[in-house]
Amino acid sequence: MLMRHAIAPGSGDLPGFGLEDCSTQRVLSEAGRAQSSAIGARLRTHGIASARVLSSAWCRCKETAELLGRGAVAIEPVLNSFFADRPTTEAQTAALRGLLRDWIEPRPLVLAICQVNITGLIGIFLVSGELLLV
């Protein structure tokens, strides 16, 4: 499952942001937090009690993934946004395709990522909090 992070007002990254400091990043709004929790509940309703949950290192993606409540969240660098580093688009998207192609675990895989990565992978635009089964 590809999931765009939940509602985080704005777009792109703030000037001078740091991955280790959420106070320098766009983060989920209260509506985004509620959205993430509601999506997690909906996944449970549809029989997904647990999953392998991977996230980019961006705080809005990590928090989205954590609030789903479907399992421990692991940071996967190939999921990191390339919004400010467009020359890496092709290589990073190829690596993401490889991750999906090589997935062999029986439990579902949930990827919490940014829009630019989703568009690079499948060529469509998901709204905040939208999920896509692949």
What residue spans do the PLM features occupy?
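Internal catalytic-core helix/loop-beta-alpha segment
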Residues: A91-T93, G98
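Active-site-adjacent alpha-helix immediately C-terminal to a catalytic or transition-state-stabilizing loop
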Residues: G98-V134
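Active-site-proximal alpha-helix that buttresses catalytic centers in soluble enzyme cores
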Residues: M1-P77, F82-R86, A94, I124-L132
